[in-house]
From Swiss-Prot:
Protein's UniProt name: Chaperone protein ClpB
Pfam families: AAA, AAA_2, AAA_lid_9, Clp_N, ClpB_D2-small
Region Linker, residue ranges: 340-548
Cellular-component GO terms for this entry: cytoplasm
Length: 857
C-alpha cells in the first residue's frame, strides 16, 4: 500500500482541492504551495483551527500562498487528467507516512503532513514570515490530543467540540452576546438543575420567540461575570450544531462516530455544559437502517450525569417527540418559559437598544420601543413577545438605514429632471434651425441652470448632513467598543484601565455626541433631507405593512374623513339614517382608540324587508374604510343550512376531506385581519353556526381546525336578516314596531346570541321619495360606464319620477328599480350605440313624455 492509498479522507480532499487550484492557475504540477493554499481557504481545516487558537489573521497567509503559486511554471493547454504531482509533494507525503508510523498512525492525516513538512521550504518561509512555527506545531499537537489515526475518517473528529459547537462563554467574554434582561427565576432554576448529581439536564420549554436561547446566553454571561454558584464557575457553555454534525456524513456510522467523539470530548473536558437548541431534532437524527439515532447515543451519558446538557424546544415539539419516549423524557427536567408581559418586553427592548443603534447607526426613541411592545402585542397575534417587538424595531431601523445610505428623493428627482432637459436640448439642436426651436433651447437652458443650482445646494446640504450623521454613528460605535473594553478590563482586574475608559474616554465621546445632536436638531428645524431616528410612526408603518391594519396615527385629513363617515355612507344608502348613525358611532369609537380591546370593532344585526339597503350598507362601509369593497368578506348563510356545513367556517376536522384547506371564515380573516364580515341572511343558518359566532362576538377570536387562534378584533361583524319584515311593514309606529320585532327575534335566536351584539338595527321600508334618490345614485353608475367614451348622460326630474314609479314596489324595496333602469335606460342606450346614433362627445338626455321614457341626443 503506497502513501496515496494511506491518506485520510480529509487529506485526499485537500489534495483534490490543490489539484483544482493548480488547474485554475495553469500549473502543470501540484506542489506544496497548492496544498498550503487549499488548507488555508478551507475554513474547517485543522490548520485553520490552529491559526484561530493562535489568533493569527489568515488573510495575509492566503495572499502569500497565492503569490507562491503564481511564481510556479505555467502551461497553456492543461486538463485535470494531465496535471502531475510534483516530486517535492510526493516526497512530503512519504515523510508524513514515516512520521505517522512512528506515532502509531495507520493513515496519513493532514496534521501529520503539516508537522512533517513545516521545516521544509517553501512552507517554512511561508509560515515563519507571519507566526512562530514552533507554536503552530504545539497547537496542531494539542488539537490531536494524543489520538491515533486508525481509520480514514479519524482525523475528522479531532477537536470535535470546536468543529461542531459554538462556545457561548467565549462569545460572552468577547461581549458579542446581547444583554439578557429579566428571566432571573428561569436562570436560577436552570442553575439549580445543573448542580444536581444525576439527571442534571434542564430543558427549556416555551413558544417560539419567548427567549429560550437568550436564557442560555444569560447563563453564559453570568458564568463569565462569576455570578453563579462555585460549582458552575469556570464552566463552558457550548451550543451544539446538529446540522454541522449530520452534514457531510457520507459513510454509514460516520454520524454516530462524530457524536460519540463529541460526547467523549465533553466528558474528558469535565467543565462543558452542552446546549442543544431545537433538541427535538436529536430524535431520529442520523438514524438509518441498523444504526442508532442521536437520542439513543446520548441517553446513557445523560442518565449517569456524565453529560451536562441544556435543551430548548417548543411545547408542541416536546409533546410530539419527548412525551412519546419516556426514557428520554425522564432524563430532562422541564423549565417552562411564559411569554413576557408588555412591561417586561419593554425592559428587554431598552436593554438591547444600544446594540441595535450601534449596528444600524441610527437613534431609536423610547417612544418607538413602547410602540413596538404595545402594537406587536395588540396586532401581531400569531407570534410572541419579545421576539416580535425586537423584529419590529430591527426592521424599522433597517428601513431607516437603507434610506440614509440611498440618495434622497429630492436629489433623485432633480437628477432625472436634468437628464430629461439635456435629452430634449440635444434633440432640438439636431433639428433644423427654427425660431420655435431656438426659443425652446433658451427656455431649457434657463431651466437647466436653475435645476443644476438647486442640485448643487441640495448636494451640499446632503453632504453636510451626512458628515454630522456619520460622526454621530462613529461616536456610537466607538463608545460601544469602549464599553466592551471596559467590561473586559474589569474581568481581568485592570481597574485603572476601566476607570480611564468609564470616567474619561466615554464621557468625552458622550459630550461630543450631545454637541452633534444639538447641531442636528438645529438642522432639522430648517428641514433636513435625512432622518436619523426610529420613531413611533416608523413602528406603526411596519405594523401596517405586516398586518394590513391601518395603525399609523391619523393625519388631519383622515380625522375629517372619519368625522364625515355618516354623510359619506348616506351618499350610497338612502333612507336609513338610524342604521348609518349606529355604524358611524362604532367607527368613531375605534378610530379614537376607545373601543374594547377584546371584541370586534362593532357587531350589528340588520333587520328589514328585502331591498332596503342592508347588504348595500355593508358594501358601502367596506368601500369607505378601504377605498374598495375587496375587504368585504361575504358569507352567504344559505350555504350553511345543514349541520355538517357549519364546520366549513373553521375547517373540516382531522381525517375529513378539506382539512388542509382551513376554514372559509378563519382563512379569510387570517389573510385580511382588517375587514367587514357580512353574514347574509343569518336566519337561514343552522343553529351550530350561532355557537361558533358566540366566541367571535364576545372575545374577538376563533380557533380553527388546526388549533390556530384567529384574531377578529379588527373586524366589523354585520349580520343581515329578513326576520320580522312583515312586522316592520305593518307597524308605522316606531315603539310598537320595535317591540314586535324583539318578540319575533326571541323566537329565532337565543338570548346569549342577541346580548353579544352591539346593536340591533331596524331598516325602514323605502318610500317613493327615497326611490327617486336611489334612481339618481344608480344612474350615476351608468354615467361612469360611459365616461371613458366621453358620452355624457342627463336624467330629468320627470324621468326620475317616472322610473321610480315603474320600479317601486313596497314589498321588494329597491330591487325592481335595477330592472326598470335596464329596460328604460340601458337598453335604449345599447341600441343607440350599436346603431351609431351616438358616439364620442355625444350628450344624451332622458326625459318622460306621455308616460314613457324617451332619449334625446
Amino acid at each position: 500500500m503506497n502513501a496515496f492509498e494511506k491518506m485520510t479522507h480529509q487529506l485526499r480532499e485537500t489534495l483534490e482541492q490543490a489539484l483544482s487550484l493548480a488547474l485554475h492557475a495553469k500549473n502543470p504540477e501540484v506542489d506544496l504551495p497548492h496544498m498550503a493554499w487549499a488548507l488555508l481557504i478551507n475554513s474547517t481545516s485543522i490548520l485553520n483551527q490552529a491559526l484561530n487558537k493562535m489568533g493569527v489573521d489568515k488573510s495575509a497567509l492566503e495572499l502569500e500562498a497565492k503569490s507562491l503559486v503564481d511564481r510556479l511554471p505555467q502551461s497553456s493547454s492543461l486538463t485535470k487528467e494531465n496535471i502531475k504531482i510534483s516530486k517535492r509533494l510526493a516526497d512530503s507525503l512519504t515523510q508524513a507516512e514515516a512520521l505517522g508510523v512512528k506515532g502509531g498512525d495507520k493513515f496519513i492525516a493532514v496534521d501529520t503532513w503539516l508537522l512533517a513538512n513545516l521545516k521544509e521550504e517553501p512552507l517554512k518561509s511561508l509560515f515563519s514570515k507571519y507566526l512562530d512555527v514552533n507554536e503552530l506545531k504545539k497547537n496542531l499537537e494539542s488539537i490531536r490530543g494524543g489520538a491515533k489515526i486508525e481509520s480514514a475518517t479519524d482525523d475528522e473528529n479531532l477537536e470535535s467540540l470546536a468543529k461542531y459547537g459554538i462556545d457561548l462563554t467565549q462569545k460572552a467574554l468577547e461581549n458579542k452576546l446581547d444583554p439578557v434582561i429579566g428571566r432571573d427565576e428561569e436562570i436560577s432554576r436552570m442553575m439549580q438543575i445543573l448542580i444536581r448529581k444525576t439527571k442534571n439536564n434542564p430543558i427549556l420549554l416555551g413558544e417560539p420567540g419567548v427567549g429560550k436561547t437568550a436564557v442560555v446566553e444569560g447563563l453564559a454571561q453570568r458564568i463569565i461575570a462569576k455570578e453563579v454558584p462555585l460549582s458552575l464557575q469556570n464552566k463552558r457553555v457550548v451550543a451544539l450544531d446538529m446540522s454541522a454534525l449530520i452534514a457531510g456524513a457520507k459513510y454509514r456510522g460516520e454520524f454516530e462516530d462524530r457524536l460519540k467523539k463529541v460526547v467523549e470530548e465533553v466528558k474528558k473536558a469535565g467543565n462543558v455544559i452542552l446546549f442543544i437548541d431545537e433538541i427535538h431534532t436529536i430524535v431520529g437524527a442520523g438514524a438509518s437502517e441498523g444504526s442508532m439515532d442521536a437520542a439513543n447515543i446520548l441517553k446513557p451519558a445523560l442518565a449517569r450525569g456524565e453529560l451536562h446538557t441544556i435543551g430548548a424546544t417548543t411545547l408542541k415539539e416536546y409533546r410530539k417527540y419527548f412525551e412519546k419516549d419516556a426514557a428520554l423524557q425522564r432524563r430532562f427536567q422541564p423549565i417552562f418559559l411564559n411569554e413576557p408581559t408588555i412591561n417586561e418586553a419593554l425592559q428587554i427592548l431598552r436593554g438591547i437598544k444600544e446594540r441595535l443603534e450601534a449596528h444600524h447607526n441610527v437613534t431609536i426613541y423610547d417612544s418607538a420601543l413602547v410602540a413596538a411592545a404595545k402594537l406587536s402585542s395588540r396586532y401581531i397575534t400569531d407570534r410572541y413577545l419579545p421576539d416580535k417587538a425586537i423584529d419590529l424595531i430591527d426592521e424599522a431601523a433597517a428601513e431607516l438605514k437603507m434610506q440614509i445610505e440611498s440618495e434622497p428623493t429630492e436629489l433623485s428627482l432633480i437628477k432625472r429632471q436634468i437628464q430629461r432637459l439635456e435629452v430634449e436640448k440635444e434633440a432640438l439642436l439636431m433639428e433644423k434651425e427654427s425660431t420655435h426651436s431656438e426659443a425652446r433651447i433658451k427656455e431649457i437652458q434657463a431651466e437647466l441652470e436653475n435645476a443644476k443650482e438647486r442640485q448643487r445646494t441640495l448636494l451640499a446640504q446632503f453632504e453636510n448632513e451626512k458628515a454630522v450623521f456619520n460622526e454621530i454613528a462613529s461616536i456610537k460605535a466607538k463608545a460601544d467598543e469602549l464599553r466592551r473594553e471596559s467590561e473586559l478590563a474589569k474581568r481581568s482586574g485592570d481597574y485603572n484601565k476601566a476607570a480611564e475608559i468609564d470616567y474619561g474616554k466615554i464621557p468625552e465621546l458622550e459630550n461630543r455626541e450631545k454637541e452633534l445632536n444639538t447641531q442636528w436638531n438645529r438642522m432639522q428645524e430648517s428641514g433636513t433631507l435625512l432622518k436619523n431616528a426610529v420613531s413611533e410612526e416608523s413602528i406603526a408603518g411596519i405594523v401596517s405593512r405586516w398586518t394590513q391594519i391601518p395603525v399609523k396615527k391619523m393625519l388631519q385629513g383622515e380625522k375629517e374623513k372619519v368625522l364625515g363617515v355618516e354623510e359619506e355612507l348616506r351618499k350610497d344608502v338612502v333612507g336609513q339614517d338610524e342604521a348609518l348613525h349606529a355604524i358611524a358611532r362604532a367607527i368613531k369609537r375605534n378610530k379614537a382608540g376607545l373601543s374594547e380591546n377584546n371584541r370586534p370593532i362593532g357587531s350589528f344585526l340588520f333587520l328589514g324587508p328585502t331591498g332596503v339597503g342592508k347588504t348595500q350598507s355593508a358594501k358601502t362601509l367596506a368601500k369607505f374604510l378601504f377605498d374598495s369593497d375587496k375587504n368585504l368578506v361575504r358569507i352567504d348563510m344559505s350555504e350553511y343550512m345543514e349541520k355538517h356545513a357549519a364546520s366549513r367556517l373553521v375547517g373540516a376536522p382531522p381525517g375529513y376531506v378539506g382539512y388542509e384547506e382551513g376554514g372559509q371564515l378563519t382563512e379569510a380573516i387570517r389573510r385580511k385581519p382588517y375587514s367587514v364580515v357580512l353574514f347574509d341572511e343569518i336566519e337561514k343558518a343552522h343553529p351550530d353556526v350561532f355557537n361558533i359566532l358566540l366566541q367571535v362576538l364576545d372575545d374577538g377570536r376563533l380557533t380553527d381546525n388546526k388549533g390556530v387562534t384567529v384574531d377578529f378584533r379588527n373586524t366589523i361583524i354585520i349580520l343581515t336578516s329578513n326576520i320580522a319584515s312583515d312586522k316592520i311593514m305593518e307597524n308605522s309606529d316606531k315603539e310598537r314596531r320595535e317591540s314586535a320585532v324583539k318578540a319575533e327575534l326571541k323566537r329565532y335566536f337565543k338570548p346569549e346570541f342577541l346580548n353579544r351584539l352591539d346593536d340591533i338595527i331596524i331598516f325602514n321600508p323605502l318610500g317613493l321619495a327615497q326611490i327617486v334618490e336611489i334612481v339618481e345614485i344608480m344612474f350615476e353608475g351608468i354615467r361612469e360606464k360611459l365616461k371613458e367614451r366621453q358620452i355624457t348622460l342627463e336624467l330629468t326630474q320627470s324621468a326620475k319620477e317616472q322610473i321610480a314609479e315603474v320600479g317601486f314596489d313596497p314589498v321588494y324595496g329597491a330591487r325592481p328599480l335595477k330592472r326598470a333602469l335596464y329596460e328604460e335606460v340601458e337598453d335604449r342606450l345599447a341600441e343607440l350605440i350599436l346603431e351609431d346614433k351616438i358616439s364620442e362627445g355625444s350628450h344624451v338626455v332622458f326625459d318622460a313624455q306621455g308616460g314613457k321614457i324617451i332619449a334625446r341626443i
